Amino acid sequence: MILFTADWHIKLGQKNVPVEWATKRYNEFFDQVHQQSESCDMHIIGGDLFDRIPTMEELSLYFSFIRKVKKPTLVYDGNHEATRKNRTFFSQLKQASRDINPLVNVVDISYVDEDLGFGVLPYADLHRKDSIEHFDTKQPLFTHVRGEIPPHVKPEVDLDRFADFPVVFAGDLHAHSNTQRNIVYPGSPMTTSFHRQEVETGYLLINPKDWSWDWWPFTLPQLLRKTVTNPADMIPTNYHHTIYEIEGDIQELASVENTEL
């Protein structure tokens, strides 16, 4: 089996997100990934592992993850790893990652796995001329591409160019429910923004014999936003991280002290 995840968006120092809480959540996530990968032959990470050019603290998190990897792991870049057109800072992590753990292969150019029979189109190559057409459409493709979420989110390339592939496993859109056409998104394993309700996040388990797949959920802390009218209802939460919005008239709101919540 192949474990497929994407859109980790490792980032510390996000507004309203305590670094200690975020670090603990990443480590819980890493533990779940390592546990799940034990029953798999390979792990593919489909781009946007980082949210930006990483800080030293964010690199330390990444290195702590790959140091414990025990199964072949292929990592390719997404749009958040792009530095300029057709370039990615992942190129600077290839050798360092392999030196830390030879099982980790960072891919920054188009790649074909001859053994299992699939292609990898990193984001750095996505917008090159005929980049999609260079692949064998009889084989599955792994890539990082924005699909469509009507009415506001438009595809970044003509999705018809992927139509002849048996299946396309992709990073970018953060919800598995955005799976469309023959493009399957695992979604982001961790909420990267605050939601009103808990959302399902997860990963794909892919059978390389017939390229069938199943989606499974992660169990991780989430970022939640709640609206209250009484400041007494602003209750700190230990597992999830919750921030509060207070509704009321101007005089009432003026009397509320500033708080981390």
Task: List each language-model region with its residue ranges.
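Short, well-ordered alpha-helix to beta-strand connector turns
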Residues: C40, K70, T137-K138, F165-P166, ...
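Conserved beta-strand elements of the Class I
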Residues: L3, G117-G119, L204
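Accessory, non-catalytic peripheral segments of nucleic-acid enzymes
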Residues: E38, M42, N207-L261
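Conserved beta-sheet core of the metallophosphoesterase superfamily
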Residues: P151-W215
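Metal-dependent catalytic neighborhoods of phosphoester/phosphodiester hydrolases
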Residues: Q14-N16, G47-F65, D77, A82-N101, ...
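N-terminal active-site segment of His-dependent metallophosphoesterases
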Residues: M1-L61, F65, S131-K138
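Conserved catalytic scaffold of divalent metal-dependent phosphoesterases
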Residues: E81-R161, P189, D210
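Active-site neighborhood of phospho(di)ester-bond hydrolases with catalytic His/Asp-centered motifs
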Residues: F4-A6, H43-D48, T73-R84, P102-I109, ...
